[in-house]
Amino acid sequence: MKIIVDMMGGDNAPLAVLEGTAQAVKEYGVQVIGVGSEELVRKTAAEHNIPLDGIELVNCTETIEMCDEPARAIRSKKESSIVVGLNLLKEGKGDAFVSAGSTGALHVGASLIVRTLKGVKRPALATMVPAKNKAYLLLDCGANVECRPEMLAAFAVMGSCYVNRVEGRTAPTVALANNGAEESKGTPMLREAHQLLKATPGIRFVGNIEPRDVPNGDVDVVVCDGFTGNVILKLTEGVAKMLLGMLKEMFLANLGGKIAYLLLKSGVGSLKHQMDSEEYGGAPFLGAKQPVIKAHGSSKAKGIKNAIRQAKICVENDLCGTMQSALDELTTSQAD
């Protein structure tokens, strides 16, 4: 198996990407095609004593910056690491693509270069979000700001396949993010989506879920448009950061707090581990014909390594093939 990795993507590239890639090669036994500035990658590897065993480098002369307009960048920067990597994936030179680069460019590239599964207009960005009972899959979390009901039905089908195949959960539950639990709640689009999801084959739709209940982790998949999903994701990240910061201040405030921290150290460590997004890897663009994984822009080595692990699981379990079969069933049911 070969995983294509963007060596230039993210705030900590290429060092963190190199470290995470080398760890993944060693731990997971994958082969990697690293796309980026070969000179810079080799120099960084030499300076930090990072082995390049199992990593084939493909030189790129351009980089897509976060400030670049996504569609224009994909069309004009043909020698960028993202475009080169996605083309290698399309040509069958690798089995999946991992990048911590521009989300917008990856979304456009996944649509225009890799192309989408039949029945999918545009790929949905999905991510596992830490929660109280168990992490849940949130999609769309930023790629498609406006969605039609049929798109949300496709998201539900693909999300169920992902949680089943990658997370190993049988018969995952699906909920629609809304401002109330009743069927009558929400905009006309959400009310129509609710009825469509009730009739969608192959998923366990449990109805609407209110934002206050999402962090409990009572469902496996939360479906919404990209605007709503991005707000949920960023609010969750902000609240988690605030609470951990408040705990730290409380423990360091006085001697009693420091003693309490020593007694609760293992529990606090478990909480931080549970809330660490890097443990879950990256965010897949569900609906692309082949696995495209977006690692967090601030990913360190652990995040990159886990994103590669995630890509490996997607390939091993034929995620894209499974999603296409489920989408075909959805299309047939909608035509009846």
Regions from the PLM with identified roles:
Residues V5-P14, A143-A153, K294-A301:
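Short, glycine-rich nucleotide/cofactor-binding loops
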Residues L15-A16, Q31-I33, E39, V145-G207, ...:
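Glycine-rich phosphate/diphosphate-binding loop of Rossmann-like nucleotide-binding domains
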Residues V25-Y28, A46-G54, E167, L197-I203:
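Short helix-capping segments at alpha-helix termini
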Residues M1-R42:
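N-terminal phosphate-binding or glycine-rich loops at protein starts, especially the Walker A/P-loop
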Residues S111-A124, M128-L138, D218-V222, G226-A335:
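Glycine-rich phosphate/nucleotide-binding loop
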Residues N49-G94:
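Phosphate/nucleotide-donor binding subsite
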Residues A13-V17, E79-G92, A96-A110, L117, ...:
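Short glycine/serine/threonine-rich phosphate/pyrophosphate-binding segments
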